[in-house]
């Protein structure tokens, strides 16, 4: 059984897209997919009947973006003016925010108005969430899991389709709750911190990027990251490097913990221990087996000013690294 786990966030999503397009071209068909944040869209195109859906989407995107404007200035443009049908800055919605902050009788109300927790307003059309939810929830061939974060109970929320529910390690625990994939679920999984919460939930990338533990039923996991693992970041010389550092650590810390858990399972089995999963109503307990984890990761560091900007270079790095991955595995 093969599982694919995809990290995702902002302008770094194009790497996973390049990887997925290459895997599709090579005929790789995962049984399970764990996907976080913006990589949800790449997975959506990856599973379409059109085998070139990802490439077509990004080709159109890059044509519209390659206008000679340097990345730094694009970042500033998007940060201050937003991106049509994606998000708009909340300072442009000042009159809409007035009723939520009045009557301005306390200092806190003034502070909340001038320094809101909702920096941006999501502008994705409802059809966007409907299409993804319907496509994922009705997929009978691939188990799909997306994750959000519930800020009220400090738990991961796993949105899954029926195939995932029947296959993955999804016994309810104190660490996460399991829900069926719905349009609201897709929205929650894409709810950036800067938008404010959606029904108490945020984008899952702030907690797990991606979720790996339910994939331990697989024989092999292909992990696709948005930043190089096991490599140092660029030197921290200024405040923007500090923001870059915090962003990368957000992606890495929980991931390292989950990889260590899988390594611990493998070590215990190697040392002769018999490990079994708890028995449930629809799944008799099964013995754990060694889990092979392979990583496809970028060779390019992307930083704070690339947060909103996807590039063809990063997409092509995904294509190249996936081809290298396939060649290395074929030659073993």
Report the location of each language-model feature:
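Patatin-like phospholipase
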Residues: 1-33, 44-332
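Transmembrane-helix signature of multi-pass solute transporters
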Residues: 40-42
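Catalytic nucleophile serine of serine hydrolases
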Residues: 36-37
